[in-house]
Design a protein with these regions (language model features):
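Terminal connector regions
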Residues: 447-482
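Short acidic, flexible loop segments centered on an aromatic residue
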Residues: 408-422
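Asparagine-centered strand-capping/turn motif at beta-strand->loop junctions
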Residues: 403-407
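Membrane-embedded alpha-helical bundles of multi-pass integral membrane proteins
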Residues: 2-260, 308, 321-359
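Short, solvent-exposed loop/turn segments enriched in Ser/Thr/Gly
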Residues: 394-399, 440, 454-459
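Cysteine-centered iron-sulfur cluster-binding motifs in ferredoxin-type domains/subunits
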Residues: 115-130, 221-236, 267-315
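Hydrophobic alpha-helical transmembrane segments in integral membrane proteins
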Residues: 363-387
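Intrinsically disordered, low-complexity Pro/Gly/Ser/Thr-rich segments with frequent PxxP/GP/PP motifs
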Residues: 425-450
């Protein structure tokens, strides 16, 4: 072959390469493959009951707390406008940000600990995405029926039955979602006040946030569901860094179950070369994320244990031992360990270190909260007049004190000073501050002229509540001119 210029063209050899064979159970999916809807089957069992226990417990706490009162206020309220967090008897201010930092550290460390011990325990039983998806699926099951009925309904035409069932289901989802959004906003705005404003169609931002969080609940729990766990949640991606071969996870005993296949109950399946797995696929049908646990550990698995319940029910019907699918460790399955041997390996150095650090942090934070003084003081020197001589032969320094009353009742405080001979408070020694308010106060300290050498001297301010209890000491500097 030649080009237009008459020179021979260079031919690039192309050698076809055969694609590598996939491993057993491995599938290749396109990035742009259409998402297939999952229809989880209902199942009964130990882990299914525990999931509902957690659903009821978490939702009783979530929906109930905003309606409980503590004195004249809401028991739990994060008042961003007033910059105060009310948690039972505690009132936290921006100055208490250290407690929020400590809480976040404790939460992260707890997640690391639970993951090291039992994998995605949080995801399977307490994560809001899991909890609300379970509630939405319960509504769907009650109206449209179990898995096979829902599949038939979705594949059928728009009959009267399909229209009314879909309408009722979507209506209940919307009502529940709006109620969830209303409750969530009620943690930041007093919920009774919020209810009155919404009934009167007042408060544009309040309505916006209720609708926003309601829509988020509706979309995540009603439609996205397992896609949040598989693609949007970062925890699924970095969990492998916290797993090891002694982490309790949902496992399939391949040595016992393979080769899988259907069989007649009373026939000796072992003589036919079969394992305990009858390949009924119930473990796949009940999975809320639609994976096949028999293909090994997958990042999509949320550790809910529903496949364990399904498999145990089948094993009971076949008169086989339970535990073909069970919570175990990779080492436990490979070595054939007993439950006690597995649990002993679970309490490994990594877990003990996490536990020790977590206990220390919790005890430290609790002790700090218990010993926390409901009084805060900041001292700023008056730079306009660092030191001056006043009538009576006194040397005077002026300070500005910001005193915060961190209680929920008005308080009267006494200001005293010590640290130098003859030092006294020349300004009003007592002030009154309203509940949960702060006040700037000008304080004049005086000493006899000549009673202290030239230079700076450390003095201490003692601020105490006349009603008793709160007392705080802060240091500052008294300047004596040369």
């Amino acid at each position: 072959m030649t080009s237009h210029s008459g020179k021979p063209r260079k031919v690039i050899p192309i050698t076809p390469v055969a694609s590598e064979p996939t491993l057993k159970g491995e599938t290749i999916s396109s990035l742009y493959e259409a998402q297939k809807k999952i229809y989880p089957r209902s199942i009964s069992g130990v882990f299914a009951r525990w999931r509902w226990v957690m659903v009821v417990f978490t939702q009783l706490v979530f929906y109930g707390l905003p309606w409980l009162e503590w004195g004249q206020r809401q028991m739990v309220l994060f008042d961003l406008g007033a910059r105060r967090f009310y948690i039972f008897s505690l009132v936290l201010y921006p100055q208490d940000f250290i407690y929020l930092t400590a809480l976040l550290i404790i939460s992260a460390l707890s997640l690391f600990l639970f993951t090291a011990v039992a994998g995605r325990l949080w995801c399977g039983f307490a994560c809001p995405q899991t909890v609300y998806t379970e509630i939405f699926m319960w509504i769907e099951h009650k109206i449209e029926g179990d898995r096979s009925a829902r599949v038939r309904l979705d594949s059928s035409g728009w009959t009267f039955e399909k229209i009314w069932k879909k309408t009722v289901k979507q209506s209940l989802w919307v009502v529940f979602s709006v109620w969830t959004g209303f409750t969530f906003v009620g943690y930041f705005i007093p919920i009774r006040q919020l209810g009155v404003e919404l009934m009167a169609l007042q408060g544009g931002w309040q309505i916006f946030w209720v609708v926003f969080y309601g829509f988020a609940t509706y979309g995540n729990a009603g439609f996205l569901r397992e896609q949040v766990c598989k693609y949007m949640c970062p925890y699924a991606r970095f969990q492998s860094a916290m797993f090891d071969k002694d982490t309790l996870i949902v496992t399939y005993d391949e040595n016992r179950g393979e080769p899988r296949g259907p069989r007649i109950k009373k026939v000796d399946y072992k003589a036919n070369g079969l394992g305990d797995c009858i390949d009924c696929t119930l473990c796949v049908q009940v999975c809320p994320v639609g994976i096949d646990i028999r293909e090994g550990l997958q990042y999509e698995c949320i550790g809910c244990g529903l496949c364990v319940d399904a498999c145990n029910n089948v094993m009971d019907k076949m008169s086989y031992p339970r535990g073909l699918i069970r919570f175990s460790t990779q080492n436990g399955v490979a070595q054939g360990w007993t439950q006690s041997q597995i649990l002993r390996r679970v309490m490994r150095p990594r877990v003990l270190i996490y536990s020790g650090v977590l206990v220390v942090l919790c005890v430290t934070m609790l002790a700090s909260l218990i010993s926390r003084t409901p009084l805060k003081v900041d001292i700023v020197r008056d730079r306009a007049a660092l030191s001056r001589i006043v009538a009576g032969g006194k040397l005077e320094n002026i300070y500005r004190l910001q005193i915060m009353n961190a209680t929920e009742t008005p308080q009267r405080y006494r200001i005293e000073a010590r640290g130098l001979q003859g030092i006294a408070v020349a300004s009003e020694p007592e002030i009154e501050i309203d509940a949960a308010q702060s006040r700037w106060v000008a304080v004049r300290l005086q000493i006899p002229y000549g009673s202290a050498a030239a230079g700076s001297h450390t003095v201490e301010f003692d601020i105490s509540a006349l009603a008793g209890g709160a007392r705080l000491t802060e240091k500052s500097v008294f300047l004596v001119p040369r």
